[in-house]
């Protein structure tokens, strides 16, 4: 396949100088395109950009946030750092059992265990991105144990602010009003 230098020589510099300058100004094609700028989309964009990918997020609404903005925002994770000072004994096994019970025993035990094991690390990652939670864990309706982390900001606002900032800081492009 011919390279740019051979094409320039063949066509003559004067006849293609303007198109080459214009081509150089066009943004590179993204490696990753994320559809939706809610919590999951922004998290995917931030992580892909952290790994060096050129990321473009396409959001149909006029602002980021999606359904995460209207969620309760509580985050469940085994968290000895917060639970032990409150006198709460918890474990990955107990969390896994609670997930299976709340799923009416229809949940995949392997996936429940992956969620229970990974929730603590994800909590730390969220906090490293600027997400802030209240200092005590609580038990919420539908939960079986006090392991829920309540955001400092209402609903999902804190998640969106932290993930949106991380995605932008890492170089992701976010486009709203996409049809």
Located regions from the model:
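Beta1/beta-strand and adjacent pyrophosphate-binding region of the FAD-binding site
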Residues: 27-38
């Amino acid at each position: 396949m011919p390279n740019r230098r051979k094409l320039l020589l063949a066509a003559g510099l004067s006849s293609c100088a303007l198109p080459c300058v214009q081509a150089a100004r066009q943004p590179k094609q993204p490696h990753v395109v994320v559809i939706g700028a809610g919590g999951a989309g922004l998290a995917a964009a931030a992580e892909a950009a952290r790994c060096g990918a050129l990321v473009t997020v396409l959001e149909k609404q006029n602002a980021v946030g999606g359904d995460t903005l209207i969620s309760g925002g509580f985050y469940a994770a085994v968290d000895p750092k917060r639970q032990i000072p409150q006198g709460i004994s918890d474990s990955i096994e107990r969390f896994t059992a609670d997930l299976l019970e709340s799923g009416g025993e229809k949940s995949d035990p392997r996936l429940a265990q992956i969620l229970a094991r990974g929730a603590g690390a994800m909590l730390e990652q969220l906090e490293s991105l600027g997400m802030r939670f209240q200092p005590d864990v609580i038990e919420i309706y539908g939960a079986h144990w006090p392991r829920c982390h309540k955001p400092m900001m209402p609903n999902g606002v804190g998640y969106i602010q932290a993930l949106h900032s991380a995605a932008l800081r890492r170089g992701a492009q976010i486009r709203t009003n996409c049809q």
